[in-house]
């Protein structure tokens, strides 16, 4: 049976998740989600208090608990180095000097060197100190079946209880 997992997002910059270039990918952050979700499972990202506050500070109003994205994992999870080397995802490697924010926010940043150690491409979202956290997730999740709402995130009329039979969890990561 397919499982559904949600989490509260603290950032929404196009990095994690990365909804660009025809697939939504989750290759950084949320290591437990990336380690435990598989093909057919659902993952949902909701706004956290921190994300709502950050958006407000930048003149954007979004609701707490708003659905930012929903994805069904449509492929077997890819080990991070396999994701990095997959020609389909070369466009998801960040280019810091690019004018296009979609190119700057690429999430395809980890590969293994000849000694089997993870290396990290320069990027605008994660410093080297995030490498251990990110690579502990082992996998990149890929979806061709997704809905990304970003700043147009929403809470349905009547709240999540109407759709889910209960309120949205207050935890950072939860089963739906």
Residue spans of the language-model regions?
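Short, Lys/Arg- and Gly-enriched loop/turn segments at beta-strand edges
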Residues: 50-68
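A general structural signal for short secondary-structure junctions and capping/turn motifs
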Residues: 33-36, 59-63, 137-140
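Contiguous surface segments at macromolecular interaction interfaces
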Residues: 79-176
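Compositionally biased, charged N-terminal/linker segments
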Residues: 1-39, 47-52
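Short, surface-exposed beta-edge/turn micro-motifs
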Residues: 39-41, 145
């Amino acid at each position: 049976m397919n499982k559904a997992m949600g989490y509260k997002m603290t950032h929404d910059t196009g990095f994690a998740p990365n909804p660009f270039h025809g697939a939504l990918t989750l290759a950084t952050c949320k290591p437990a989600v990336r380690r435990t979700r598989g093909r057919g499972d659902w993952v949902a990202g909701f706004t956290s208090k921190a994300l709502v506050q950050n958006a407000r500070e930048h003149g954007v109003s979004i609701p707490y608990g708003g659905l930012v994205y929903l994805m069904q994992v449509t492929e077997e999870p890819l080990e991070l180095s396999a994701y990095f080397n997959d020609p389909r995802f070369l466009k998801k490697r960040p280019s810091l000097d690019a004018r296009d924010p979609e190119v700057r926010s690429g999430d395809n940043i980890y590969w293994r060197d000849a000694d089997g150690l993870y290396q990290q491409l320069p990027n605008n979202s994660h410093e080297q100190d995030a490498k251990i956290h990110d690579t502990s997730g082992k996998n990149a999740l890929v979806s061709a079946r997704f809905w990304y709402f970003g700043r147009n995130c929403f809470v349905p009329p009547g709240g999540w209880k109407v759709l889910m039979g209960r309120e949205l969890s207050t935890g950072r990561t939860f089963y739906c």
